[in-house]
Amino acid sequence: MSKEQGNLPKLAAPAQRALTSAGIMQLEQLTKLTEAELLQLHGMGRNAVGTLREALKSRGLSFRTGMENRKMDKTIRTQLDNIRSEDAQLQNKAYMSLMKETEKSVDWAYEAWDELIEGLTHKDNHVRAICGQLLGNLGKSDPKGRMFKDFDKLLAVTKDEKFVTARHTLQNIWKVGLGGKKSQELVVKGLEKRFKECIKEKNCTLIRYDISVCLRNLYDATTSSEIKEKALELIELEKDVKYKNKYATVWKK
């Protein structure tokens, strides 16, 4: 059993890790989720949900029923509009704010989803990068599994003509895996594909290093042995000993 975190009750370690990965530190945050959405988190079981339900009840709170109006507030709406602003300062402010907001689960993900997907092919590479990173963050707010349909579109941005855009998207894409076991498998499969195919690309060694870091981050968040095994397997594909050793350092920390 883990120690209490914030005002959360004691839970088994897998359930506690699930909450931590989703950025949930306080009971009040659970009022934005339905029980079904909570169960989507990898490591969360019905016993833990029952414990959390009782803890909420003791404070006069409850999980979201799924029937409430889920429309985003005006501030979020304005920020989403501003990521397409031609004013770089306004655009960056919106980006920073939305990235911070989506560190935790949010209930407006599906209201923003389609416009973020459209943003992946926007003429402004900054918009493409922002939308790519936000979609990565929204992986934990996707109980309906929309990402399974759209993941290839997100992965495509990791090959963007602007390498800085591609890299920012790649470095954040592992967070899609925080949506549950199937989401983890989706991410690992996509990263494996990129690791192998980037051999023909100019920045192959940087891409492979970033992929190694992504897999380590996902492993740290989930402690899934399959992720570590796949990462080490991919590192063995590198022919250059210098870079093979560099990728391996990610797993020695």
What name fits each language-model region?
Residues D73-K74, D107-E115, G145-D152, K182-L191, ...:
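Short sequence/structural elements of tandem HEAT/ARM alpha-solenoid repeats
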Residues M99-K100, G136-G139, W174-K175, S212, ...:
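Structural signature of alpha-helical solenoid repeat scaffolds
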Residues K71-K93:
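N-terminal "cap/leader" segments of large eukaryotic alpha-helical scaffolds
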Residues E86-A88, K123-N125, E161-F163, I199-C204, ...:
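Short inter-helical turns and helix N-cap capping residues of alpha-solenoid HEAT/ARM repeat scaffolds
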Residues K71-T75, C204, Y209-V213, N217-K253:
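Eukaryotic acidic, Ser/Thr-rich intrinsically disordered low-complexity regions
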Residues M1-R70:
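Compact, charge-rich alpha-helical regulatory domains located at protein termini
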Residues A94-S97, C131-L134, T169, V187, ...:
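Conserved hydrophobic register position within alpha-solenoid helical repeats
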